[in-house]
């Protein structure tokens, strides 16, 4: 009988992203998307430091509009991942700027 291995760190991160999306999706109706209200709730709770540091009060509305690539007023999981990926890239860029320059191969 094959032994079932524990999830890797990457697999746990993916599971966590799915769980967080599902935690906020569906409160306003459709279970597979985030409405604008659900998106704002997610941003103000899960990304509170980012949200509070924004000087422009319209930034979240513009983010929602830009992320909503099919213009249905909802964010599906793929659109949600664009947000997560963009934030991860920005964090990675900041990290690279903060550490001493290293030769990349």
Swiss-Prot record:
One example GO MF annotation: protein homodimerization activity
Phosphoserine: residues bearing it: 5-6
SUPFAM superfamilies: EF-hand
Residues where N6-acetyllysine is found: 3, 27
Residues given in the record as Ca(2+) 1 binding sites: 33, 38
PTM (free text): Phosphorylation at Thr-10 by PRKCA significantly suppresses homodimerization and promotes association with NCL/nucleolin which induces nuclear translocation.
Record's GO cellular component terms: adherens junction; cytoplasm; extracellular exosome; extracellular region; extracellular space; nucleus; ruffle; secretory granule lumen
UniProtKB keywords: Acetylation, Calcium, Cytoplasm, Disulfide bond, Metal-binding, Nucleus, Phosphoprotein, Repeat
Domain of life: Eukaryota
EF-hand domain segment(s): 13-49, 55-90
Modified residues (Phosphothreonine): 10
Record PTM N-acetylalanine, positions in chain: 2
GO biological process: negative regulation of cell population proliferation; negative regulation of DNA replication; positive regulation of smooth muscle cell migration; signal transduction
Residue positions binding Ca(2+) 2: 68, 70, 72, 74, 79
Modified residues (N-acetylmethionine): 1
Major location (coarse): cytoplasm
Alphabetized Gene3D superfamilies for the sequence: EF-hand
SMART domains registered for this protein in UniProt: EFh, S_100
Subcellular location: Cytoplasm; Nucleus
Subunit structure: Homodimer; disulfide-linked.
Function, in words: Facilitates the differentiation and the cornification of keratinocytes.
Protein name: Protein S100-A11
